[in-house]
Amino acid sequence: MLRYRSMNIKELFQEAQRAETLTHAIGIYEKIIQQDPQNSEAYNNIGELYGNMGQPGRALPYFVKATELNPMNGVYYSNLALVLHCQGHVEEAISNYSKSIALQPSWSAYNNRATLYNYRKEYDNAIADCTAALKLNGQNDEVCTKAHLYATRADAYMGKGDYKKALHDLNTGMALNPSDDIIGFYDKGILRCNLKLGISPCEGKGCK
């Protein structure tokens, strides 16, 4: 670590990105913080690395500090919300997703907040979030993104008992990305909707 003493902040960030291990990268970001205690990006990056290591408890204080240092960065609030979400702090997570959306609307923040609304059975709020996310320009070009949003909204529609709309969203999501990692959710959801609507499985999936 002695060689890092002569590096400036920019060089240290570049070195952290080239680090061979997450632990090594964290050590470099800590060096940045020593040089610049107000560097919110370094705090956020350490939080992300701990999150990637499956250690949300260690990530939490870094995300909190990042939002304190730069309260106008929506990504920091979204990252903080995700950690709180993983720890089961639903109210705090929703609050921070809301701050993130107010600053920098993104499909992930909307989808994650919608998931929590579904958990709380606030289905109309979940539907509104997914619909808003699907209308965002540019960010939803990836099929996986849209597929997950349709799945979350379908979950909300099923919660409301609106199986016709749920079936539409399930079929749409599965058509967008048939190899999605949540394919089991689509299959179970479609079967449930078919049973509730009294239609054949083939008809429900739009078979010819």
Residue ranges and their predicted role:
Residues 13-17, 41-52, 75-86, 108-119, ...:
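Conserved alpha-helical positions within TPR/SEL1-like repeat arrays
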Residues 37, 71, 104-105, 138, ...:
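Short coil turns that delineate tetratricopeptide repeat
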